[in-house]
Amino acid sequence: MHPGVLAAFLFLSWTRCWSLPVPNDDDDDDDMSEEDFQLAERYLKSYYYPLNPAGILKKTAANSVVDRLREMQSFFGLEVTGKLDDNTLDIMKKPRCGVPDVGEYNVFPRTLKWPKMNLTYRIVNYTPDLTHSEVEKAFKKAFKVWSDVTPLNFTRLYNGTADIMISFGTKEHGDFYPFDGPSGLLAHAFPPGPNYGGDAHFDDDETWTSSSKGYNLFLVAAHEFGHSLGLDHSKDPGALMFPIYTYTGKSHFVLPDDDVQGIQYLYGPGDEDPNPKHPKTPDKCDPSLSLDAITSLRGETMVFKDRFFWRLHPQLVDAELFLTKSFWPELPNRIDAAYEHPSKDLIFIFRGRKFWALNGYDILEGYPQKISELGFPKDVKKISAAVHFEDTGKTLFFSGNQVWRYDDTNRMMDKDYPRLIEEDFPGIGDKVDAVYEKNGYIYFFNGPIQFEYSIWSNRIVRVMPTNSLLWC
């Protein structure tokens, strides 16, 4: 279709009345502003069965506001209520890819994949945020993420029309899907096909970097090129193709297993994968599941595993899974131990010889600190688990086969510590992966087993599988 004819369609209007229901006086979200509701309406219109450039819905199913909100909550693993709550709004406010999660995103007919393995790309223009060399390096590295696991080859063109045309632009930039200024929508790409098919556009109102500051161009480009090759968004929060941007750290990037499965379904495997071990997202109901750390946080329970955590809330019917860095970008990908200090409204996170103090989702100034500040000798290299007792002001730390007890009032370790875990808590084994306390019971986790230990009787009263904590 000629672009001029396509532009004429933009004058068509979508006359259906479409708005979020305003909560009544009994709802918990009375404090949400009109701006919040407007943001939510824009979000759902953009990412859940969006209009095509003609102003017409591509699909008729799930086009009511409540249906779209339910679909969005289901996509992100939130409690499906059809109501705009704080958790849903938090997701909507995170920076993300501009490609819809449900519904097509294209101007011209798309195809499932490219019919060839040798593809070309061209960098049409550059962002002023990085040198030309840095931009070229980021894009080359992003394409390599996909060529490493498939037979695909990518060749750069310096003029003419390539299969994948890459450009930076702002607001209205010629494809009828405008950018929105800083943050929010970061970039978008079109699926394989003619004309715009395969093209990737980056919002130049963002600050593009090669680090954790601003938005990392390599990570965003690798995601967008996944769309250019035919992949849709993934519901897996650990996948590169998850729609929300998360800086994953400075270490060598390895494509997650979910993305490998998706791209190899389209193009098949490559001859030799330089990274044969691709990270998988943990399954909460895996009978062999072990945990890294557990802590409460303002009435919720946070359960850490690898680079993820599950969030448990008494009012939810299922555990919600998130990347740790999507909430705390400055923390390490993996943590060793965690505990809450309710009277200070703080949680403490441990990794190796360092620990962080957090107020909600904000890291306190002056952190991380060394665990030696708490009184640990130099031969203690990590804390494997920790639990705080608000009534006594004591905190138990587990490291190797030993347990330490810290006095919060005197800010020092208690005398006669450390002790052997087996002596203080007989029956739970000689190591602790994670621990928490509730209603007079301590719950010790050791591999796939958890022990319910009575503080009053000093004995194990129940043995359960670890995954029962996650309602499995």
Swiss-Prot record:
GO terms for biological process: bone morphogenesis; collagen catabolic process; extracellular matrix disassembly; extracellular matrix organization; proteolysis. The modification Phosphotyrosine is found at Y367. One of its GO terms (cellular component) is extracellular space. Seems to be specific to breast carcinomas. Can bind about 5 Ca(2+) ions per subunit. Zn(2+) 2 binds at C97, H223, H227, H233, M241. Ca(2+) 3 binds at D180, G181, S183, L185, D203, E206. GO terms for molecular function: calcium ion binding; collagen binding; endopeptidase activity; metalloendopeptidase activity; zinc ion binding. Its cofactor is Ca(2+); Zn(2+). CDD domains: HX, ZnMc_MMP. Ca(2+) 2 binds at D163, N195, G197, D199. This is Collagenase 3. It comes from Equus caballus (Horse). The lineage of its organism: Eukaryota, Metazoa, Chordata, Craniata, Vertebrata.
